Each structure stands twice: as C-alpha cells, then as structure tokens.
Design a protein with these regions (language model features):
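Short, Lys/Arg-enriched N-terminal segment that forms or immediately precedes the first helix
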Residues: 1-14
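Conserved segment of winged-helix/HTH DNA-binding domains
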Residues: 9, 73-90
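Short capping segments at the starts of secondary-structure elements
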Residues: 20, 30-37
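Pre-recognition alpha-helix immediately N-terminal to the DNA-recognition helix
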Residues: 23-25
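Helix-turn-helix DNA-binding motif, specifically the short coil turn and the N-cap/start of the second
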Residues: 35, 46-49
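Alpha-helical residues within the helix-turn-helix
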Residues: 40-41, 52, 58-59
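Beta-hairpin "wing" of winged helix-turn-helix
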Residues: 59-69, 75
C-alpha cells in the first residue's frame, strides 16, 4: 500500500503533538481559545519558546489564530480530531 496524503497528514499531526509543551497547549486549547500571553502563563515557558511551539502546531494544521488588535488568539482547527487522538492515548 503506497503512502498517500492522508498518511502524511496523520504523521505530521502526531509528530507535532509529540512534545510535552505542545501537548499541554493543545489540551488547554480544548478548553477554550487562548491568547499567546495566556498560553505562556499556563505552560510557564518563555515567549519565544511558546511562539516556536505554536508555529509548529499551526504549520501542522492543528491550530490557527485570529488577530485581536495586538493579540494573537489561538484555537484548534478541528477539536474533534484532537479529542479522538488524546482519547486513544489514554
């Protein structure tokens, strides 16, 4: 069976979730949309580090953001898929 786009998407998603900080960010975003400063306080890591993790999640198609003035607020693009993945890990 050849590798197709669906396999690549799933692998990319799992790879992006395979870091404790990113996993915590995703769990917090399951609760509600969060702005960058809120996320930084919740996970207690530096601003540049948070930005790097959020970019990884965004480029993997897991999160997206909306601009509120000077703030970037992040949300999960497909929370149902994330819930399924996290449930499978229990």
């Amino acid at each position: 069976m050849p590798i197709n786009q669906v396999h690549r998407y799933k692998a990319q998603m799992l790879k992006a979730l395979a870091h404790p900080v990113r996993l915590l960010i995703v769990e917090k975003l399951l609760e509600k949309e969060q702005c960058v400063n809120d996320i930084r306080e919740l996970v207690n890591v530096s601003q540049p580090n948070i930005s790097q993790h959020l970019n990884t999640l965004r480029f993997s198609g897991i999160v997206d953001f909306r601009q509120q003035g000077n703030l970037r607020c992040y949300f999960l693009r497909n929370p149902q898929n994330i819930k399924k993945v996290l449930k499978a890990l229990e």
